[in-house]
Amino acid sequence: MGLLLLVPLLLLPGSYGLPFYNGFYYSNSANDQNLGNGHGKDLLNGVKLVVETPEETLFTYQGASVILPCRYRYEPALVSPRRVRVKWWKLSENGAPEKDVLVAIGLRHRSFGDYQGRVHLRQDKEHDVSLEIQDLRLEDYGRYRCEVIDGLEDESGLVELELRGVVFPYQSPNGRYQFNFHEGQQVCAEQAAVVASFEQLFRAWEEGLDWCNAGWLQDATVQYPIMLPRQPCGGPGLAPGVRSYGPRHRRLHRYDVFCFATALKGRVYYLEHPEKLTLTEAREACQEDDATIAKVGQLFAAWKFHGLDRCDAGWLADGSVRYPVVHPHPNCGPPEPGVRSFGFPDPQSRLYGVYCYRQH
């Protein structure tokens, strides 16, 4: 029986007449001894390929490295080693297309798109095809599939990756309910964040998030979390929970947006300065301190993960003025921890300091 030649789609321009299976074109060829395993369909004769991945969700941080575990084995075990093909890809979520991450045959591999230069297979031990992702980005969280292909036999497993982070509501300087879905995506990105998923909002509600303005989520639904039922928020008779308006038109309907930011690689700090500053002066002061003016998502992450606690209102990059409170302070607003907001004052006013961000 001829050996099976397996080549990624993008590497074989003349392959349109070949059978397509599991993201690859297959060709019966005896000419390439390096890519075949020499067994063909023998694997079907009483031997089962098993792929093992963890059932629990993996949690990590933006900028970190993480290993997505994946191992395979044969039942019953085989004496002679076999060369397999491995494919990792990120599953579709909320209408986004699937993303190829990496394909490998033996020691040869190829990564794709934004994953190039950031991913590789561990392969430290026999039958270990775990994927390492370096310099994690906000958009990397989600579900990944590990597929092992031996001839025409294939098995796969799922690994779910979640980033630890903080959800915060974001409102336009022009008031509530100003963003369509795409504008919500843009403003979250401008604040070092992404649009939050329902799971992230629900987890934030479990931790105490209470917000009465409805906002976009990643799946284009509009929802809001309520801990203390009250009249403007669905009425006092409803139980606490996450209220939903359901799916809304991505271009026509307008709401606020819930953003999600993860822990920082750098540091947010209140700049000690002899004078209060205008917004322009605040930006320049951070630059003079070898830093940049902090974004809203960075301030929330510093409050959540680094315990930033300061009762001084300061400018942020979007022109808002905020300050983070972890412990109650006299003359510092409500006793509950949170990031307080002064809204969007006149950029020329000299009433505030500034929060800066410096990368490590």
Curated annotation (Swiss-Prot):
GO terms for molecular function: hyaluronic acid binding. Transmembrane segments: none annotated. GO terms for biological process: cell adhesion; central nervous system development; skeletal system development. Gene3D superfamilies: Immunoglobulins, Mannose-Binding Protein A, subunit A. One of its GO terms (cellular component) is extracellular space. Belongs to the HAPLN family. May function in hyaluronic acid binding. This is Hyaluronan and proteoglycan link protein 3. It comes from Homo sapiens (Human).
